[in-house]
Amino acid sequence: MTLINEPQSRVFFALTCSPALRKMVSQWRASLSLRTGKPVPSANFHLTLLFLGAVDKAKIAEICSAASKIMVPEKPLTLVLDRLEVWRKSKALVLTPEDAPPELMRLSYALEQAMLRFGQDQEHREFRPHLTLARDYQSTVPEAGIPPDFFLRADRFGLYQSHKGQYT
């Protein structure tokens, strides 16, 4: 008996950042003069809505079809990234919102519910909106000369594939 291994991709749903936001956040991060961690390339800035993990490539079209049925808010989502935090367990330096809009929380939940039928073995994690600035970060929260105050606006979400250190 031969086992057929279908190629898999590590995928996640996310809101992308505009080029202008990427540039502003990248310049602000540079002002922090980080001495530890690996900065996330600004081209990879995003806000993950739901991480699916390893998925058979054959299921991607079906996953996209299920996600396309999710109602998105009539107005673009606006999220204020105004807090700088260190997440010790994941060793990440992140920007987070003090208050996440209810529409964003509902969108993440709707995606999670829509993906249940695909039987992904994903451990349930509470959705914590964030933009990762650096990985392998092992220090305290750096002092910012100018406090973070960035507006992420999005009117759609997408399915992204992750590679080691990259997103496509």
Regions found by a protein language model. Give the residues of each.
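Histidine-dependent nucleotide/RNA phosphoesterase domain, centered on the 2H-phosphoesterase fold
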Residues: 1-168
